[in-house]
């Protein structure tokens, strides 16, 4: 073979070792060594008689179009990158890639066809500014990353049932996706795609982390548990309906969703870390969290809401801040919650458009914190205002963030206002 990296004796030995580990008997001509690089279609034609190749294959260089014929399995990875003249690629016989499928920096590639591909470890599609179609028959994959492409559809991933990572970001023509995913063991992210992105994950039962940004509509018809963090940030969602969700293991953030007018989490009972709802300008009535009983970190609600129903809340292990610009909002129920010792953190603040209550809580005694509330009102007010300024800055900064910032973080439960502010700041990165 006239691969750019010719097979040396060492490579042949490596190929033999790989072939020995394969479940299929591989002719020596189909073992390409630990890795090999093809720079022309003629290189690929020399392995066209193989049903399986062993080794990591890289395709790069000045190819106008390229195809892998007859090959059904790659026992290794396939990488196609940095080819300024490659306009199309097809490998419609491949059913399995044991390693990764990487497609990167292919500036005029318009189509990529893997019509029979059912199994791969990871797919990474990054910086494909001309691609419009990508086809597979994918059934099993661990990680999917699609970033900075012109894909109008990612339906090639619609039949997947479970993944570790599913990250779709910065694809400006992608406006919809309907998924069959049932579980996500690491992170699910959709961010900075088309202006009116509509998503449906109605088979998803559990996920470790979920972060959605710049989404117009979302459906989670079956979601019951999020093990770590759940975040809805900078979306144009008119409503959120997660009526099957019962537990968020760490942080829950609903921040800077300007069109959001209704949030229904009618079965949610537990938030293990920080719980923040902030800067959702149309969310005037917050009554969809009335079954929440425990918050493992701090809680902060900031906005223009007139109604807040947290009637089942029994325990907040961090501080609490409720700040509404509406003069119709009443702090009475929340002050009763605080006086009963349910707020276990270092501060309690409740404000509306007309009045403000600020109490510095003792970390050692609920009773002493009550008795010191009056004498320390002035100093605690100053401290609370300082914390409010920091928190407001963290919340408002999210409104200008329209880029994907990587996998959703697993946040440590916050134990104070500063903790929840730090948690949200990390979530917004």
Swiss-Prot record:
Residues 361-410 are annotated as: Disordered. A lipid is attached at residue 406 (GPI-anchor amidated glycine). It is found in: Cell membrane; Secreted, Cell wall. It is a lipid-anchor; GPI-anchor. Residues 407-429 form a propeptide. Its main location: membrane. The modification Phosphoserine is found at residue 339. One of its GO terms (biological process) is cell wall organization. Residues 1-19 form the signal peptide. InterPro entries: CWI-Assembly_Regulator (IPR051648), Rcpt_L-dom_sf (IPR036941). Keywords: Cell membrane, Cell wall, Cell wall biogenesis/degradation, Glycoprotein, GPI-anchor, Lipoprotein, Membrane, Phosphoprotein, Secreted, Signal. Residues 361-401 have a biased composition (Low complexity). The GPI-anchor is attached to the protein in the endoplasmic reticulum and serves to target the protein to the cell surface. There, the glucosamine-inositol phospholipid moiety is cleaved off and the GPI-modified mannoprotein is covalently attached via its lipidless GPI glycan remnant to the 1,6-beta-glucan of the outer cell wall layer. GO terms for cellular component: extracellular region; plasma membrane; side of membrane. Disulfide bonds: none annotated. Glycans are attached at residues 21, 56, 82, 196, 209, 227, 234, 241, 267, 279, 304, 328, 389. Required for proper cell wall integrity and for the correct assembly of the mannoprotein outer layer of the cell wall. Important for apical bud growth. Belongs to the SPS2 family. This is Cell wall protein ECM33. The gene is ECM33.
